[in-house]
């Protein structure tokens, strides 16, 4: 039996891409779509409620005992960083690989977003990974 990777998404948009790009990976992939966090952000619920919700959802996912949790929602990723979550199960955050590759770029970078609600969290995390000298349009 192959180990299981849970992919946590805010929408179904990434499922097909993940399945296609990770078909050779040695994992069985289980997708979990959670739209509620985006609803909480849209309705401007207090940050502490959002953090508590993320912890609750993370605990539910960990009960499934995956080998790996892959988080594709940058809002989830940003909140995970704010709550300093620790778990025995590795959590892979979708943006970290990209940010590592962008560290050495000296030309302006153009970032395009398909979801305006992910801009704040994505840019905060981006600035943590790269130097302030990187110009973003």
Walk through the language-model features, giving the residues of each.
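Non-catalytic structural scaffold of enzyme domains
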Residues: 1-137
